[in-house]
Amino acid sequence: MRIGLLAFAVAARYVEALPVASGEEVASSSAPTTLPSTSSSSALPSPTKYTLPHEDPNPEARKAEIALKRGGFLYGPSTLGQTTFYPSGTLGTAMSQRDQALWLRDAENQTITAYREANETLRDIQSHGGLKTLDDFALLYDGHWKASVPEGIEKGMLSNYTSDLLFSMERLSNNPYSLKRLHPTKDKLPFSVEDKVVKQLTATTLAALHKAGRLFFVDHSDQKKYTPQAGRYAAACQGLFYVDARSNQFLPLAIKTNVGADLTYTPLDDKNDWLLAKIMFNNNDLFYSQMYHVLFHTVPEIVHMAAIRTLSESHPVLAVLNRIMYQAYAIRPVGERILFNPGGFWDQNLGLPATAAVDFLSSIYAHGEGGFRAGYVENNLRKRGLVGDTFGGPALPHFPFYEDAQRVLGAIRGFMQAFVDSTYGGDDGALARDFELQDWVAEANGPAQVRDFPTAPLRRREELVGILTHIAWNTGGAHHVLNQGAPVRASGVLPLHPAALYAPVPAAKGAVASSDGLLAWLPDEVKSVEQVSLLARFNRAQVRDRNQTVRNMFAAPELLAGNGEAYAAANARFVEETGRISREIEGRGFDSKGLSQGMPFIWTALNPAVNPFFLSI
């Protein structure tokens, strides 16, 4: 079936006229009720067979279609800070409006459910007299949020929240993007810790740990430049971690606040002081992770935009990209309207204001984050000394993120390898004959300004496999480690991970007389329920029932019908492999030492049978 070019233009005018909800209002059924999953426009029917340009029996119509898209789908200014371009032009605006309508409709049930469960939870907490101790935070979760967060919070996250091992291993699971190993000669020690303290904790010196490649660092000191909202407070923590030579565990060594008296805390301090230090650190880390994750939106977006402008809707590569970029262009404008707007959900819950969050995103992009190939998992982790060349230090004894990511990535790469091989007949030379593909690579390196994209011409199928694998990993893997259901289930679980602090950073140690004294820094029952409710709305509990999980990533009927038997066979293998991964993750328990993957909590953030295949929030 030939793409209807007139239909594309008509769709642009139609979708552009769709009402867009304000605040939490959800778009009604004015949006189309069914949307082809492999078309750049809601009114573009998918071809019955996808073809490469040199095999298309109607090349002139194909060229005209691309010309129409290039004229109406344009690179507009970045939204939500200064990162990559955002769609503009008649067709670009139409796609944005369509995706926003889709997103708002998908979010409706989750939002209604989370609000209902929030009210029920608050009533239950108040019936117990409120949050009077740290352990009372269990009331936030016990028996609640069963519809909006059906998997519940990660096992061990509440029962072991005081554990130093839990705190340190969060850097290798909940947020693996802020940690680096300090190079013994290229990196200086970021701050000092008393020799006798280091000796007592590690049986060696700080310099020796550094020289041996056993010292790791997280730096949130740049958050110091932002002013917290009235009545809220924030540190700007730096943290040192190490691989212990005796226990072979990854453990915390020290936390420096960088504000006020600029105290440095260690595990040898009073247990309540040290727990407060970990809470302050996690508050900074939650801010970091929620804004860093936006790069997992912007990077695939700009590559997809370049593809829309250069590939025909009949091209099999664009068909796959359109599938995995489902509703992708909703997030930035919706975020601006209801999350990062003045007084919006961010300001209602976080310590630092939304203006700081958006500035932070712009800042990390301006300083080089968001490179395409630099974001490949192996490249990213190697650069930070976490895998591969470990700067002469020992390998991490456990790295849960990497362990699970390797498996999910392997399944995605296996599918993409089979897809590319079947599309190009196992012939690298066929890439050169695909002038649309080569135009895409040139466009990405040119007008789209994609950072660190493979250069034109693309000569090897393996390069294309890498590109497609990375985009699919961003939408179905990396994003969900930091966002989606991960914050409500792990990285935002109270009391260890408050979105804001409600008392000043201490000017001296000994400020916390008892564990219950920590409540002064933590949200009360109302703000606690609001935090959980917001994070619950990030989750997408319905995708499993709707067959929209990572396991279904490539299973769109149009793709199965239009790409032939080899594609269908590759999809079947992918479904089988991701099923095995999911069963293993869901079957995890604690070993005889009370650990799972070396951690005192069970991490499930990369479960392909739970996560959406798309950029959900």
Curated annotation (Swiss-Prot):
Residues carrying sugar: N109, N119, N160, N547
GO aspect biological process, one term: lipid oxidation
This protein's record includes keyword Glycoprotein: yes
Cofactor(s) the record lists: Mn(2+)
First and last residue of the signal peptide: 1-17
Record's keyword terms, sorted: Dioxygenase, Glycoprotein, Manganese, Metal-binding, Oxidoreductase, Secreted, Signal
GO molecular function, one term: metal ion binding
EC number: 1.13.11.-, 1.13.11.45, 1.13.11.58
Domain named Lipoxygenase: residues: 122-617
UniProt-listed Gene3D superfamilies: 3.10.450.60, Lipoxygenase-1, Domain 5
Binding site for Mn(2+): H293, H297, H479, N483, I617
Main location: secreted
Biased composition (Low complexity): 23-48
Region: Disordered, residue numbers: 23-59
Effect of L350F: Changes the stereospecificity of the enzyme to almost 100% 9S-HPOTrE as final product from the oxygenation of alpha-linolenic acid
Similarity field: Belongs to the lipoxygenase family. Manganese lipoxygenase subfamily.
Function in brief: Lipoxygenase that metabolizes linoleic and alpha-linolenic acids to 9S-, 11- and 13R-hydroperoxy fatty acids. At the end of lipoxygenation, the intermediate products 11S-HPODE and 13R-HPODE from linoleic acid are then transformed into 9S-HPODE as the final product. The intermediate product 11R-HPOTrE from alpha-linolenic acid is transformed into 9S-HPOTrE and 13R-HPOTrE as the final products. 9S-HPOTrE is further oxidized by the enzyme to 9,16-DiHOTrE as the end product. Also acts on gamma-linolenic acid producing 9-HOTrE(n-6) as the main metabolite.
Name used for this protein in its record: Manganese lipoxygenase
